[in-house]
């Protein structure tokens, strides 16, 4: 299978390297990733600057842009044939609940979807871990199954894997997105020149994390697989808004 592999942690990230090693024997892999860490980039595109691509010693390609840029330039310009699958990851850290809105990992997969391709975003629920190899093995299982049972071209799967050795992962659960409380207060500081600066604080605590959610599956030791749609219409609210708008 022809696979385009990208991420948001950058071309030198451990999760990217481990996933490439796990898949390269059975698949034709092209790796195009940002030249730096782009965590939190969401779906941003570099519209105000040209993109440059450089091949690394590893054979991976580094782009001076965002995760979405990497997939866009790969599919729309660099590759001679469209990939059959876009995979983004393995991300260093979870992408659960509201995280997907900000996630460059999910954004790279979403860009694949915009290109008309099935796509998977993969995250390990730890920033540093000895379990990236285990996570990569789990991804290989999903890819092997996908070969035999293809996904629709407009399908995005958001996969989160618990920080456990391979043999301790209990299985896979199909989940819905949970939800977090609002983010914690930003951290105010002063730079060396006496100017006020702000750092983002911790993410919000889990709010909707009950059975059926991605949060709950991870807490129980399962891999969570959440189907995502790029249609952000709140369909259940359409009639309420129609009624509301008539009163203006």
Swiss-Prot record:
Catalytic activity entry: a ribonucleoside 5'-phosphate + H2O = a ribonucleoside + phosphate
Main location: cytoplasm
Enzyme Commission code: 3.1.3.5
Cellular component GO terms, alphabetical: cytoplasm
Keywords: Cytoplasm, Hydrolase, Metal-binding, Nucleotide-binding
Binding site for a divalent metal cation: 8-9, 39, 91
Compartments it resides in: Cytoplasm
Superkingdom in the source lineage: Bacteria
Disulfide cysteine pairs (residue numbers): none
Molecular functions per Gene Ontology: 3'-nucleotidase activity; 5'-nucleotidase activity; exopolyphosphatase activity; metal ion binding; nucleotide binding
Pfam families found in the cross-reference section: SurE (PF01975)
Cofactor note: Binds 1 divalent metal cation per subunit.
Family: Belongs to the SurE nucleotidase family.
Protein's job: Nucleotidase that shows phosphatase activity on nucleoside 5'-monophosphates.
UniProt-listed NCBIfam families: PRK00346.1-3, PRK00346.1-4, surE
Protein name: 5'-nucleotidase SurE
Annotated organism of origin: Pseudoalteromonas atlantica (strain T6c / ATCC BAA-1087)
